[in-house]
Amino acid sequence: MENKSLQPPLPRSERRIRVLHNDVTIDSYGWLRDREDPDVLAYLEAENHYADEVTSYVAELKADLIAEIEKRDSCDGAPPPFQVGFFFYFQKSQSGLLHSAWWRRPVTGGPEELVFDPNTLPGAEVFYSLGALEPSDDGRYIAFSFDLIGNERYELRVRDMTNGREIWRDPSRAGRLVWAADNRTLFFTRERADRRQHDRVVRLDVETGRSEVVFEEVNERLALVVRRSGSGAYLFIDVIITSDMSSRIQRAAAEVWCLPAERPTDMWRRILARELGHEIYAEHWGNEFLFRVNDTGPNLRLVRTAIDDTSPSRWQEVVPHRAGITLEEIHVLEEHVIVLEREGIQPRLVAHHRNGRVGPSIVPVEHSCTVTVGLSAGGSYSCARHPYRVSALTYKICSFVTPDIFIQHDLLTDKSKVLYRTLVSGFEPELYEARVVMAKAEDGVEVPISIVARRDRGEDGPVLLNVYGCYGAQSLPAFFGWPSSMTARLSLLDRGVAFGIVHVRGGGELGRAWHEAATRDQKRLTHTDLIAAAECLVEHRFASRDGIVIEGRSAGGGTVLAAAVLRPDLFRAVLAEVPLADIIDTELDFTLPYALRETAEYGDPHLANDYQYLRSYDPYYNLTPDRRYPPTYIDAALHDSQVLYYQPARYVAQRRSKAVDRDPDLIFRTRMIGGHMGVSHGPGVAEEAAFRMAWILHRLGQSGR
C-alpha cells in the first residue's frame, strides 16, 4: 500500500525577482543551482528518501519485472564483427564481469586477441560509457575513449597493439576519432571546457607524441565533426549545425573541408563555402564527391561533382528533391551509392549504380521500423562502417516486434541472406501486433503514432505514449535501446498495456519540414500534437479515457510536462526523465551547455516576442495553485551535462510549493552516479526500467503481480 502519511520535502524559499520585457517573475529556488552546497545535496537526498518510501509498495512487482527483463536480456550469440584492415573486431561478454570486452581476430584466420577491456578501468564498476573505438588500418594502434562519470566528457587513449602499452592519454573531452591512411596520424575533436561544443580538430602523431590544433570554429552555434569517407581515401571536417539532429548519423553541415587521407600533414581544403541556410553532407566516390544538399528543398537531393571543382555550377543531379520523401543518408560502395530515404515514416534503401542504373530497392515489410547501414562499435562517437570494395550491402533492421536482424543483400543478384538474427528468450513475436495510427492535429495535419500491443488485447485499454519532438531528431520503433526498450516494454504489453511513439512535429521522422513546423513561435504544436494523439486513441477506442500515461526524456520530458499543464485531465500519469523543465531560464544563461542551441528550437527569451511565446507554455512558469496535475515521476542526474539536475529539481520544488498538500503524487529521484543517459550497466539498468514499469502499472490500477 502507498504510504500516505509521509510528508513530501520542500526546500527553503529564497525569493529572487526578475523583470524582463515588463514581466515580473519570482524565482524561489534558484539557489538549487549550486551542486556543492550541502543544503542542495540534502534536499536531493530528502527527495530520494521520500521517493523510496512512498513507492515501496511496488517492491514485489518490481522484483517480478526485473526477473522478466533479465530473462529477455539474455540473448543468444553475438552480432557480426566489423572489419577494419586485416582484422575483425567484436565484443564478448565475460562471466562475472560487468562489461563486454573488445577483441579481434585476423581476417585470414588465427587466434583472438584482446583489444580493450573496460573492466580494468578504475571506477568502471560504478559507471562506464564508451565514446569511440577506432583501429588504425594496419591494426597496430587502437584509439578509444570513455566516460567514467556520466558527464559525457570522454577521455582519449591510444594503445600500441604490438606490446599492449598505452602510448597516449588525453583527458580533455575528446569527440569523434579518425585515423589517417599513414597509420600513425590520429585526428580527433576536442570540446570547449565551458560548454558542450567540439570546436577544435587536433592532429596527433602517435609515434612522436606531438599534437596540434589544425582547425578551430569560433561560431558558438556550430561545432566540428571529423570523419573518414566511406572509400577511406579522404578525411572530412564537417562544421555542423548543433541545433539540427535530423539525421541519426549524418549531421547537416554548414561547411565541409577535405584532406586526402594519405597526406595528413597537408592543408585542409574547403569544398563548399559557408552560406546562411546552406546544409550539406559530403562523401567521396571514385573520382567524384557526392553532396547531399538542401539547395532546392528541405527534403534534400543528391548531386555529384568533380573533386577538383566543387562549385554548384558543376553539380550533376543523381537524386532530385521530392515532396514527401526525405533523403536521410548516403553510403558508398565501389560501384554503388546506397540512399536511405523515408516516405512518410516508411524507410527504404535504394541502390544507384555508377552507370546510372537505379535499383534494386529494399523496402522493409514493416511500415514503421529502424534501418541502419553498416556496423559500428556502438559508442557515442563511433562511426558506422561498411566495406567499400564489395557488391553486397550489409544493414540492420529492427522494430517493436523484430529484434535486430543483420542482413546482407547482393546488389548484383538482388538476393538477401540473414547474417545474424537476435534471439530474445521467451519472446514470441506472433503474439504482438504493430501498426501505425494517424491522429488529426488541431490544425488538420495528420500525426502518425507507431503503436504495438498484444493481439488478444481488447478495446479501451491502457496505453503508454512516448514522445520527443525536438531538434528534428527521430524517435523510431526499434527493439533495443531508447525509446522502444522492448525487453522492458513487453512486461507492459503482456499485462494489457499498449505502447506507442507519437511522431509529433518538431521531430524529424517525416523530414525537415516536419521539424521546422514546430520550432520557435510554433513550438506549442509539439504539445498539442501529443494531446491530439491521445484524444484520437480514445475516440477510436484503442485507449480508455482514464488509461493514458505519457513519458518523455530530456526535451521530450519537457514536452510531456507542457502537455500535462495544458490538459491535466487527459493523462492518468506522467513520466519525465531528465526533463527540460524550464526553457526560459536555460536560454537566458548562455554559459550553460546547449543554451545557444536551444534558441534555434525554442526562440530567444532575450527577444520580447520570443519571451512572451515561451512564457505561454514553459512548464516551470505555468504551474498554478488551482490545478491538480497528474501523478508524475521525474528523475534527474547530478552529473548530467545536458539537462542540469537543478532544472527538474526547481520544477519539483515549484510544483510542491503551489499545492496545498505539496503534491504527494509527485515523485522525484536524482541519480548521484551517472549522467543524462542513466545507469550505464549491470543490474541497475533492469532495476530502473522495472521501477518505471511498476510505477506505471500501479498508476493504471494494475498493482498485482
From Swiss-Prot:
Tell me the disulfide pairings in this chain. Answer: none
From what superkingdom does this record's organism come? Bacteria
Q: Which GO terms describe its biological process?
A: proteolysis
The record's keywords, sorted A to Z, are: Hydrolase, Plasmid, Protease, Serine protease
Q: EC number(s)?
A: 3.4.21.-
Mind telling me what this protein is named?
Answer: Uncharacterized peptidase y4sO
Q: What family is this protein classified in?
A: Belongs to the peptidase S9A family.
InterPro entries attached here? AB_hydrolase_fold, Pept_S9A_N, Peptidase_S9_cat, Peptidase_S9A, Serine_Peptidase_S9A
Q: Which Gene3D superfamilies match?
A: alpha/beta hydrolase, Prolyl oligopeptidase, N-terminal domain
Per UniProt, the enzyme's principal EC class comes to: hydrolase
Active-site feature positions: S554 (charge relay system), H676 (charge relay system)
